[in-house]
Amino acid sequence: MKHFIGNDWDHVLAPVFESGEYHKLHVFLKKEYQTRQIYPDMYHIFTAFKLTPFKDTKVVILGQDPYHNPSQANGMSFSVMPGTPLPPSLRNIYKELYDDVGAQPVNHGYLKRWADQGVLLLNAVLTVPYGQANGHQGKGWEMVTDAAIKALSERGQVVFILWGRFAQNKIPLIDQDKNVIIKSAHPSPFSANRGFFGSRPFSRCNAALKEFGRAPVDWQLPPNPEA
């Protein structure tokens, strides 16, 4: 079995990692990283899976692909590296977080505290070329992340937070008899006022976890980003 991640995700995703299609993706990415500026750093590609093992995952916040500007992407959806200005979508997430559960905004965008509590911060596509949003869409990452979503869905008792049309296109992969889906508009400035603000995803998530008999997420981030 190939050990790309270093925890139980390697076993869960083994059929994908051992496939010819994944080998093609691996060859493509090797060339991309050698010839272009690709984000995140190759050692951070699987950070979301490394920080949140399969057995511990109780929430999924699904993004599209990584931030495509320098010093932003860190392998977790919506999260940015410490010391990086907050992207507009994350500012809006923090605003809703405060309005929903009273979590005090912080001046960094490093979301590791959530990941450590079982929140899988998953992008559907795990790499992106500099300045080219969706530049690696359709290159093969979807088979990995779709397999992860399906495996979690089959296990059950997961809350899937799906913001925007792209994330909601994954709903057919999720068994809604065994899991909870929380959906709204995307927190982007282009759509936040059309249903994201006021959607209360964080309190609704914790209410669903309580129904599952699982511990709620403490959404309050630390004032200083953790290393």
Swiss-Prot record:
Keywords: Cytoplasm, DNA damage, DNA repair, Hydrolase. The keyword DNA repair applies. It catalyses: Hydrolyzes single-stranded DNA or mismatched double-stranded DNA and polynucleotides, releasing free uracil. It is found in: Cytoplasm. SMART domains: UDG (SM00986), UreE_C (SM00987). It is an enzyme of class 3 (hydrolase). It comes from the Bacteria. Disulfide bonds: none annotated. GO terms for cellular component: cytoplasm. The active site is at 65 (proton acceptor). GO terms for molecular function: uracil DNA N-glycosylase activity. GO terms for biological process: base-excision repair, AP site formation via deaminated base removal. The keyword Lipid metabolism does not apply. Belongs to the uracil-DNA glycosylase (UDG) superfamily. UNG family. Excises uracil residues from the DNA which can arise as a result of misincorporation of dUMP residues by DNA polymerase or due to deamination of cytosine. This is Uracil-DNA glycosylase. The gene is ung.
